[in-house]
Amino acid sequence: MSKQPRKQRTRTETAPLHERQRAVRATLSDELREEYGQRNVRVNAGDTVEVLRGDDAGHEAEVVTVDLTETVIHVEDVTIEKADGEEVPRPLDSSNLRVTELNLEDSKREARLEEGDEQ
């Protein structure tokens, strides 16, 4: 790995999707941290998150989509108004979110969490 910032930026911008998953990790709430023994987790659609920063700070809602190409997360009822009045989802960075409830419909994800090896 290079130390040069321009090469670091290029690497993150051109990273394949399976590597970009690491860029959409958010911290777990204290209760979940105790339960699973890990500090953060990859955010999936269906997880419930709390917005920590910005105009919508304190808002708690379900994740609608996780966009790996842009490494952004869209949360239910967190929108921004366009110039023509249309409401569109506001893209949020995972560092500004805290996961308060996990979507455990995926049995493989649940097994990884129990092992303490969530990717």
Curated annotation (Swiss-Prot):
- Gene Ontology cellular component? large ribosomal subunit
An example GO biological process term is: translation
A Pfam family the protein falls into:
KOW
What GO molecular function annotations does the UniProt record carry, in alphabetical order? rRNA binding; structural constituent of ribosome
Q: Which keywords describe this protein according to UniProt?
A: Ribonucleoprotein, Ribosomal protein, RNA-binding, rRNA-binding
Q: Which InterPro entries match?
A: KOW, Rib_uL2_dom2, Ribosomal_uL24_CS, Ribosomal_uL24_euk/arc, Ribosomal_uL24_KOW, Translation_prot_SH3-like_sf
Q: Which Gene3D superfamilies match?
A: 2.30.30.30
Q: Which PROSITE patterns does its entry note?
A: RIBOSOMAL_L24
Chain coiled-coil ranges? none
Q: Which family does it belong to?
A: Belongs to the universal ribosomal protein uL24 family.
Quaternary organization: Part of the 50S ribosomal subunit.
What this protein is reported to do is described as: One of two assembly initiator proteins, it binds directly to the 5'-end of the 23S rRNA, where it nucleates assembly of the 50S subunit.
Q: What is this protein identified as?
A: Large ribosomal subunit protein uL24
Q: Which organism is it from?
A: Haloquadratum walsbyi (strain DSM 16790 / HBSQ001)
What does the record give as the organism's lineage?
Archaea, Methanobacteriati, Methanobacteriota, Stenosarchaea group, Halobacteria
What gene codes for this chain?
A: rpl24
